[in-house]
UniProtKB/Swiss-Prot annotation:
Mg(2+) binds at residue 204. GO terms for cellular component: cytosol. This is Hypoxanthine-guanine-xanthine phosphoribosyltransferase. The active site is at 148 (proton acceptor). It catalyses: IMP + diphosphate = hypoxanthine + 5-phospho-alpha-D-ribose 1-diphosphate; GMP + diphosphate = guanine + 5-phospho-alpha-D-ribose 1-diphosphate; XMP + diphosphate = xanthine + 5-phospho-alpha-D-ribose 1-diphosphate. Homotetramer. The keyword Lyase does not apply. Belongs to the purine/pyrimidine phosphoribosyltransferase family. It comes from Plasmodium falciparum (isolate FCR-3 / Gambia). The keyword Hydrolase does not apply. It comes from the Eukaryota.
Length: 231
């Protein structure tokens, strides 16, 4: 697989782990914080499964980039957990691979993006970032938590064009099977999940549930409890 450079096309991408519509686990089978439990329906993807899948994604990414230096953009705040775990595995695989190297594999950058209030897209994208002009002529991998409608990544990739980046690829932990999806595909995907609003593993509902270890479904009571007062 060559280094991807057609954002949204998902050319030559490996298949994600498919989570069926009726898959999931009883909350009582896992350690769930008491202050969250009543607001959740079920565990969709357990923490251990998420971690192992991220390790495999790191392995796939390393195979594609080999020893080419690339820069990783973390889209905060939802991608924080995925990003941190991915970097840990990428570093270990690179540092202890059979091929000796005298340089680090990647640089890391952080971009704050926001496009949701409650469980709905606001239709606008707020971007706060460091100076990204250093990315000119570089390979860039965008790390996103979830592709829902795909609108966020379309707008963000458009925003990046002014920096004259050499290649742009996308890694996301989850892609949601929703009729609202615009067809934007990632190059590295962890899981394909049903059309439900998910929280946990840094995914939030109005900044709540980020510290939940597992990927879970939030129920209507939870949405009502933590609903923002205005869009």
């Amino acid at each position: 697989m060559p280094i991807p450079n057609n954002p949204g096309a998902g050319e030559n991408a490996f298949d994600p782990v498919f989570v069926n519509d009726d898959d999931g686990y009883d909350l009582d089978s896992f350690m769930i914080p008491a202050h969250y439990k009543k607001y959740l329906t079920k565990v969709l993807v357990p923490n251990g499964v998420i971690k192992n899948r991220i390790e495999k994604l790191a392995y796939d990414i390393k195979k594609v980039y080999n020893n080419e230096e690339f820069h990783i953009l973390c889209l905060l705040k939802g991608s924080r957990g995925f990003f941190t775990a991915l970097l840990k595995h990428l570093s270990r695989i690179h540092n202890y691979s059979a091929v000796e190297t005298s340089k680090p594999l990647f640089g890391e950058h952080y971009v704050r993006v926001k496009s949701y209030c409650n469980d709905q897209s606001t239709g606008t994208l707020e971007i706060v970032s460091e100076d990204l002009s250093c990315l000119k002529g570089k390979h860039v991998l965008i790390v996103e938590d979830i592709i829902d409608t795909g609108k966020t990544l379309v707008k963000f990739c458009e925003y990046l064009k002014k920096f004259e980046i050499k290649t742009v690829a996308i890694a996301c932990l989850f892609i949601k099977r929703t009729p609202l999806w615009n067809g934007f595909k990632a190059d590295f995907v962890g899981f394909s999940i049903p059309d439900h609003f998910v929280v946990g593993y840094s995914l939030d509902y109005n900044e709540i549930f980020r510290d939940l270890d597992h990927c879970c479904l939030v129920n209507d009571e939870g949405k009502k409890k933590y609903k923002a007062t205005s869009l």
